[in-house]
From Swiss-Prot:
Gene3D superfamilies: Ribonuclease Inhibitor, Toll/interleukin-1 receptor homology (TIR) domain
GO cellular component: early endosome; lipopolysaccharide receptor complex; plasma membrane; ruffle
Topology term for the membrane: Single-pass type I membrane protein
Source species of the chain: Sus scrofa (Pig)
Subunit details: Belongs to the lipopolysaccharide (LPS) receptor, a multi-protein complex containing at least CD14, LY96 and TLR4. Binding to bacterial LPS leads to homodimerization. Interacts with LY96 via the extracellular domain. Interacts with MYD88 and TIRAP via their respective TIR domains. Interacts with NOX4. Interacts with CNPY3 and HSP90B1; this interaction is required for proper folding in the endoplasmic reticulum. Interacts with MAP3K21; this interaction leads to negative regulation of TLR4 signaling.
Compartment(s): Cell membrane; Early endosome; Cell projection, Ruffle
Location of the LRRCT domain: 579-630
UniProt family annotation: Belongs to the Toll-like receptor family.
Protein name, as recorded: Toll-like receptor 4
Extracellular topology ranges: 24-632
Chain ranges on the Cytoplasmic side, renumbered to this chain: 654-841
């Protein structure tokens, strides 16, 4: 008998291995937040797990097999707030299935082929706000029993089979409904009667998404006097005429945000007819968004006339030729132009515009001055623009700018210190190349600036007054730049309100003792990815508010003894990982300090020694002061012993099952086999094993006796003992069902390796390989031994055809008969006759 302790140790990895074979996983749900949030995704559950605490609030059961939800299915979880049942093969939901979930706010049923939905299926959900029923075979809103869900805020029934847009009477009982997603259904026509409930009980905050429905007709007046917060119509129309007719049907409505267009991969219209937008004159719009249309007309002077009074305009992924001809009297306050392939920067002149986003338009290279006197927010990021002179109010035609983003552009030459832009609060230059930044105090006028990002702008800081004037700055990011002589000087004198400073990847080798003396409010300092050789703590002494200091990925060897006391008392997190620590006795004080400050150090266990050689790659925490009092010979011997013991332990752990098998072979080696074969397979292939392999071998002629884990393992016995004693020791042969699932399963490959050891120990044993499906060579080569074995030895390939099946079973039975203690001739003839009859009748 195997000792109990060894069996207990063996049981844990064996259970993980068996999860690839069983229809229900042995792995427990992932505890995301203890007692609060659990993820049970894709665990092959056939029922609601009962080992989850009743206090759970977020439960993800997606991708399981919960085909039938009975009443009170979730009564054990009264605190539940979010329940995800996506793609659980649910077909039936009974009355009161969710009864008792008084706090449930989100229910997700995406991808379930629901066939039967009881009238009281959603009863007992007094707090439900979001219901997602995407791809649930829903054919009509009339049949959806949700009229009692008065708290419902969002209803998503996209990707279903809804043909009628008629909103049921019960919508009058949903006063809080704000989002209704009907996209990707089969709605073709919309009539006045379909919206009767909105005429009677207006839902002014409702946003409606009808995208990807094949709309042909909207009855004129259907939306008259209806007020919507949002309406989305994308990839709905197969021609401009149909689109124009449908927009006419929206006449008289008031929509806060109207979205027209197509999706990138769902294009129906080759070109855009500007007459379509003329129909918008009969609508009242606040915001208009148009996306992914084809060619636009060259002349846009009158294109947006019907949108002159809108406040927000968004133009996304359009083939625009220019915007210069837009009238100046439009009342637009927010204009967004993204990825519109413009050839030159638009010289806009809007008095009303307050926010202008012009980004990812990569077909131009030169910035043109604009005149936007009331502009407060300007985003010009990602355009590959070059600025010959920056920055003052003259370029942007405004003195009211508060947000300026020029990131991810080309060369920006600094020729002005933001004269006229004193109200700026946010400034971003990251990944643009700044020129002449050291010539003068370029930020001198920006006394109101709170955020500055000059990361990766190729600045080589020489001028110590570069940050002069930034008295209100709270965040400074300047990663990826450099300093003269790789020394961080005292350049932050005016930044007395700074809270976050990022100096990563600045090639720093030294830090001036007074570099941070004027930063009393600094809380976060990033010094990672530099070239610091020592942890010099003296420069950080004035940082009385510092909480996070990141010095990871440097070349730090140690810290001088007298410096350790200078770290601020407020410091809560110090990251010293990925450095070149010396674990020599000369740094004994620092190494002891590391051990004493484990609570302060982030990832202290990951700090490793790089020298001396005998300590290389060992944890810093493994350093012992006692080693400094013994001879080098003792140290070397100790390290060598430690390595040998570690290697031995690893080898024993790695080949534990092989040793267990070897011991068992001595005990069972001479006994008679109970089974003809032990079957190794992935749980993903269990249907084939049950329906094909077991049926044809155990019910055929001659009958073979297979060892199958779900049937033949002895209850109450450790899984490891079952695998070896019942599986290998009592079987004449082993059948390995090879598939892509098998190769990708670590535990299936592990059991195959055990089978090889078994074959070696029992010379008369045999392994029969069945390739269930064609395998990609790149995937197969990942398992070198298996690839070599299949290349040099014969194996069976499953072919699902009449002739292929006949040959397959004939060859497999012949292989199994080898060594069987009865006459192979008689059985082979019987087998042949039976298969001939089966295959050719």
């Amino acid at each position: 008998m195997i000792p109990r302790i060894r069996l207990a140790v063996a049981t844990i990895p064996a259970m993980a291995f068996l999860s690839c074979l069983r229809s229900e996983s042995w792995d427990p749900c992932v505890q995301v937040v203890p007692n609060i949030s659990y993820q049970c995704m894709e665990l092959n559950f056939y029922k609601i797990p009962d080992n989850i605490p009743t206090s759970v609030k977020i439960l993800d059961l997606s991708f399981n097999y919960l085909s039938h939800l009975d009443s009170n299915s979730f009564s054990s979880f009264p605190e539940l707030q979010v329940l995800d049942l996506s793609r659980c093969e649910i077909q039936t939901i009974d009355d009161d299935a969710y009864q008792g979930l008084n706090y449930l706010s989100t229910l997700i049923l995406t991808g379930n082929p629901i066939q039967s939905l009881a009238l009281g299926a959603f009863s007992g959900l007094p707090s439900l706000q979001k219901l997602v029923a995407v791809e649930t075979n829903l054919a009509s809103l009339e049949d959806f029993p949700i009229g009692h869900l008065k708290t419902l805020n969002e209803l998503n029934v996209a990707h279903n089979h809804i043909h009628s847009f008629k909103l049921p009477e019960y919508f009058s009982n949903l006063p809080n409904l704000e989002h209704l997603d009907l996209s990707k259904n089969k709605i073709e026509n919309i009539y006045h009667e379909h919206l009767q409930v909105l005429h009677q009980v207006p839902l002014h905050n409702l946003s409606l998404d009808l995208s990807l429905n094949p709309l042909n007709f909207i009855e004129p007046g259907a939306f008259n006097k209806i007020r919507l917060n949002g309406l989305t119509l994308r990839s709905n129309f197969n021609s401009s005429d149909v689109m124009k007719t449908c927009i006419q049907g929206l006449a008289g409505s008031k929509v806060n945000q109207l979205v027209l267009g197509e999706f990138k991969n769902e294009r129906n219209l080759e070109s855009f007819d500007k007459s379509v937008l003329e129909e918008l004159c009969n609508l009242t719009l606040e915001q208009f968004r148009i996306a992914h249309f084809g060619e636009f007309p060259d002349d846009v002077s009158d294109l947006f006339n019907c949108l002159a009074n809108a406040s927000v305009i968004s133009l996304l992924s359009l083939n625009l030729h220019g915007l210069e001809a837009l009238p100046n009297d439009f009342r637009w306050q927010h204009l967004e132009v993204v990825n519109c392939k413009l050839q030159q920067f638009p010289a806009l002149k809007f008095n009303s515009l307050k926010k202008f986003v012009f980004k990812d338009n990569k077909h131009m290279h030169t910035f043109t001055e604009i005149n936007l006197p009331n502009l407060q927010f300007l985003d010009l990021s990602g355009n590959h623009l070059s600025f010959k002179g920056c920055c003052s109010h003259n370029e942007f035609g405004t003195t009211k700018l508060k947000h300026l983003d020029l990131s991810f552009n080309e060369i920006i030459t600094m020729k002005s210190n933001f004269m006229g832009l004193e109200q700026l609060e946010y400034l971003d230059f990251q990944h643009s190349s700044l020129k002449q930044a050291n010539d003068f105090s370029i930020f001198l006028s920006l006394r109101n600036l709170h955020y500055l990002d000059i990361s990766y702008t190729n600045i080589h800081v020489v001028f110590r007054g570069i940050f002069a004037g930034l008295v209100s700055l709270q965040t400074l990011k300047m990663a990826g730049n450099s300093f003269q002589n790789n020394l961080l000087p005292d350049v932050f004198t005016d930044l007395t309100n700074l809270i976050l400073l990022d100096l990563s990847k600045c090639q720093l080798e030294q830090v001036s003792q007074r570099a941070f003396h004027s930063l009393p409010r600094l809380q976060v300092l990033n010094m990672s990815h530099n070239r610091l050789l020592f942890l010099d703590t003296l420069p950080y002494k004035p940082l009385h508010s510092l909480r996070i200091l990141d010095c990871s990925y440097n070349l730090i060897v140690a810290s001088k003894e007298q410096e350790l006391q200078h770290l601020p008392r407020s410091l809560a997190f110090l990251n010293l990982t990925k450095n070149d620590f010396s674990c020599a006795c000369e740094h004994q004080t620092f190494l002891q300090w590391v051990k004493d400050q484990k609570q302060l150090l982030v990832g202290a266990e990951q700090m490793v020694c790089t020298q001396p050689l005998e300590m290389q790659d060992l944890p810093v925490l493994s350093f012992r002061n006692a080693t400094c009092q013994i001879s080098e010979a003792v140290i070397s011997a100790s390290v060598l012993t430690f390595l040998l013991v570690s290697v031995a332990g690893i080898l024993v752990y790695k080949f534990y099952f092989h040793l267990l098998l070897f011991v068992g072979c001595k005990k069972y080696g001479r006994g008679e086999s109970t089974y003809d074969a032990f079957v190794i397979y992935s749980s993903q292939d269990e249907d084939w094993v049950r329906n094909e392999l077991v049926k044809n071998l155990e019910e055929g002629v001659p009958p073979f006796h297979l060892c199958l884990h779900y049937r033949d393992f002895i209850p109450g016995v450790a899984i490891a003992a079952n695998i070896i004693q019942e599986g290998f020791h009592k079987s004449r042969k082993v059948i390995v069902v090879v598939s892509q699932h098998f190769i990708q399963s670590r535990w299936c490959i592990f059991e195959y390796e055990i089978a090889q050891t078994w074959q070696f120990l029992r010379s008369h044993a045999g392994i029969i390989f069945i390739v269930l499906q064609k395998l990609e060579k790149s995937l197969l080569r990942q398992q070198v031994e298996l690839y070599r074995l299949l290349s040099r030895n014969t194996y069976l390939e499953w072919e699902d055809s009449v002739l292929g099946r006949h040959i397959f079973w004939r060859r497999l039975k012949k292989a199994l008969l080898d060594g069987k203690p009865w006459s192979p001739e008689g059985t082979e003839d019987s087998e042949s006759n039976q298969h001939d009859t089966t295959a050719f009748t």
